[in-house]
């Protein structure tokens, strides 16, 4: 084809305006992207109060005002220029960037697809100055005096007015506003030291005053999360993790309450989400999603934030170490839970000293330390250790749970030391539930679910204490593999051996599985190997092995646990309570359902309308 053909054009340089509009396709995906970029600029400027005003879901207008450092008038034209920024000036600074923004392209991209006005005033300036974005190559920006307090206001009108094709892809006004409001919530959660206000079509939607993360998260995520959250605080070398995670019993049907931050930046990172999900994997019911607000802080040099145009993904220098740190931190936090109050959400346990250590607080409550125990069961816990066995139910009349009318034959007993938060058994209900009494009131226990969790944790610990048994295959399983699978196999032999696998590359397109973990010897070796290789490649380890192992142990525990309608003696019931107190995660069964609830004295008063 000749160069003179009308279908072929000569190579030519694009105009700055067109370049900015092309870049806007990635940076300014929808109105919420504009809100995000402008809020990040305000925070980088040191703002302590930020106002967000929207009209028609942000399409008609987005105006964001802050009280930050402001921009000097001579630098206003540079603020709207492409690839101009005050945040970095070298590759070294880029690799150690600590600010939310750094590319210097957001304002130029936004100005290319809207009517933008930037008004700013520094603290030492006599008045504010403003500049408008240019809409054609013939137009020039001019800086003019204006009114305004110290700080910056960016006013974005008629978004996509000059790119009508982009407007066609926008959703309804309420949908676009919902996305904008979610961006404000995300950033407000990351900076509780900054006050935020949000207005839509002249109506105030939200206002968040300066406070701590506990109050800010309660304000944004609601009382349900506030009542069912666990504190998270871990440090290991250069890594620091803090925030709140929701209890498994307060999980949600959608993953819309998951907020993870890396050095103050909200991210949707597969590695981090995988680590959190792995920690929850044997305490969540079905396809439920946990809620959390987690912040990870580390040296900026250890994380690359220049991975995605929206900066929502990051890359860690040592991804495996970060994954393991987050996984173990969340796992330890989930092991510290307390009772589920009757008719209320579960509450966290602040002390890490035992599986259920909240009774120290109850010991100091207004409840009397003495209560009547009808069966005289307040005896040493050592007497219960060997009683709870899975033999057949006894036909002896003494093995049946005593009826409540026998209570009067026993005198009052004293509540023992505070290592018995679940109290002591009173009776068994319909062969399913255990009724127990503690200083706070009445405890209701699902005995099968509780025993299932106890056995499950015991099986896991027993397996973890021994070396992983490997089962060599009599005939190796060979299968076709792509280049990534072969490369992962060759580069990660140590990890694969630690997981109990012997996988070798026979050719550039063939892998052979020679050994698998003995516990999974009946699984499909090819499918198992592919799943493990995928996890090792993406996360530096495999959740597949843990999931398969836990599925088998969970099934074994379920079939071994005491069944419904089995009559237990009072000592057997007390032995189960003691085992629950000594077992991590005893508050949920293997499927994420609660194993016990607390019915407090105040709850009983309400049921009988006492005190009215």
Curated annotation (Swiss-Prot):
SUPFAM superfamilies: ATPase domain of HSP90 chaperone/DNA topoisomerase II/histidine kinase, DNA mismatch repair protein MutL, Ribosomal protein S5 domain 2-like. Keywords: DNA damage, DNA repair. It comes from the Bacteria. InterPro entries: DNA_mismatch_repair_CS, DNA_mismatch_repair_MutL, DNA_mismatch_S5_2-like, HATPase_C_sf, MutL/Mlh/PMS, MutL/Mlh/Pms-like, MutL_C, MutL_C_dimsub. CDD domains: HATPase_MutL-MLH-PMS-like (cd16926), MutL_Trans_MutL (cd03482). Pfam families: DNA_mis_repair, HATPase_c_3, MutL_C. GO terms for molecular function: ATP binding; ATP hydrolysis activity; ATP-dependent DNA damage sensor activity; mismatched DNA binding. GO terms for cellular component: mismatch repair complex. GO terms for biological process: mismatch repair. Belongs to the DNA mismatch repair MutL/HexB family. PANTHER family: DNA MISMATCH REPAIR PROTEIN MLH, PMS, MUTL, DNA MISMATCH REPAIR PROTEIN MLH1. This protein is involved in the repair of mismatches in DNA. It is required for dam-dependent methyl-directed DNA mismatch repair. May act as a 'molecular matchmaker', a protein that promotes the formation of a stable complex between two or more DNA-binding proteins in an ATP-dependent manner without itself being part of a final effector complex. This is DNA mismatch repair protein MutL. The gene is mutL.
């Amino acid at each position: 084809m000749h160069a003179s053909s009308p279908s072929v054009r000569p190579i030519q340089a694009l105009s700055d305006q067109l370049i900015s509009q092309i870049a806007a396709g990635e940076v300014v995906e929808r109105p919420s992207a504009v809100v995000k970029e402008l809020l990040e600029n305000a925070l980088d400027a040191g703002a302590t109060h930020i106002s967000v005003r929207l009209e028609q879901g942000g399409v008609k207008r987005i105006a964001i005002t802050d009280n930050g450092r402001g921009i000097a008038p001579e630098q206003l034209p540079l603020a709207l220029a492409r690839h101009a920024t005050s945040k970095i000036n070298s590759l070294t600074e880029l690799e150690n960037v600590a600010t939310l923004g750094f590319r210097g392209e957001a304002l130029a991209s936004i100005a290319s697809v809207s009517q933008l006005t930037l008004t700013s005033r520094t603290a030492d300036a006599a008045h504010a100055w403003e500049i408008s974005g240019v809409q054609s190559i013939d137009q020039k920006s001019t800086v003019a005096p204006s009114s305004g307090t110290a700080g910056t206001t960016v006013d974005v009108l008629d978004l996509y007015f000059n790119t009508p094709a982009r407007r066609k892809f926008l959703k309804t006004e309420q949908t676009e506003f919902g996305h904008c409001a979610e961006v404000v919530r995300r950033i407000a959660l990351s900076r509780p030291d900054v006050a935020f206000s949000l207005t839509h079509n002249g109506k105030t939607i939200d206002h968040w005053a300066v406070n701590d993360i506990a109050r800010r998260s309660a304000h944004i995520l609601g009382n349900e999360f506030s009542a069912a959250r666990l504190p998270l605080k871990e440090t290991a070398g250069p890594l620091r993790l803090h925030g709140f995670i929701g209890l498994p019993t307060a999980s949600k049907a959608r993953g819309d309450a998951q907020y993870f931050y890396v050095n103050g930046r909200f991210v949707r990172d597969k590695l981090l989400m995988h680590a959190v999900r792995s920690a929850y994997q044997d305490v969540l019911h079905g396809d439920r999603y946990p809620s959390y607000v987690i912040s990870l802080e580390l040296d900026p040099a250890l994380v690359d934030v220049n991975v995605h145009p929206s900066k929502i993904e990051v890359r860690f220098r040592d991804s495996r170490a970060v994954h393991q740190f987050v996984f173990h931190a969340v796992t330890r936090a989930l092991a510290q839970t307390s009772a589920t109050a009757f008719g209320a959400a579960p509450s966290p346990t602040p002390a890490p000293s035992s599986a259920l250590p909240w009774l120290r607080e109850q010991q100091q409550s207004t409840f009397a330390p003495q209560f009547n125990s009808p069966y005289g069961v307040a005896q040493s816990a050592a007497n219960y250790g060997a009683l709870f066995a899975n033999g057949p139910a006894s036909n002896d009349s003494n093995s049946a749970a005593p009826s409540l009318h026998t209570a009067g034959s026993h005198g009052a007993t004293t509540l023992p030391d505070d290592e018995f938060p679940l109290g002591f058994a009173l009776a068994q209900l319909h062969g399913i539930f255990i009724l127990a009494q503690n200083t706070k009131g009445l405890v209701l226990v699902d005995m099968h679910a509780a025993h299932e969790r106890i056995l499950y944790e015991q099986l896991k610990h027993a397996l973890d204490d021994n070396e992983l048994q490997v089962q060599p295959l009599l005939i190796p399983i060979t299968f076709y593999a792509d280049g990534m699978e072969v490369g992962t196999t060759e580069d990660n032999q140590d990890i694969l051996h630690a997981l109990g696998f012997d996988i070798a590359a026979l050719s550039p397109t063939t892998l052979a599985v020679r050994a698998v973990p003995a516990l999974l010897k009946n699984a499909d070796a090819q499918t198992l190997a592919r799943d493990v290789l995928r996890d090792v490649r993406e996360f530096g380890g495999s959740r597949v092995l843990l999931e398969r192992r836990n599925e088998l142990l969970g099934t074994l525990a379920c079939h071994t646990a005491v069944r419904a309608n089995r009559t237990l003696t009072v000592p057997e019931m007390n032995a189960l309570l003691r085992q629950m107190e000594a077992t991590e995660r005893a508050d949920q069964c293997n499927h994420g359902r609660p194993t016990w609830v607390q019915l407090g004295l105040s709850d009983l008063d309400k049921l009988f309308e006492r005190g009215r």
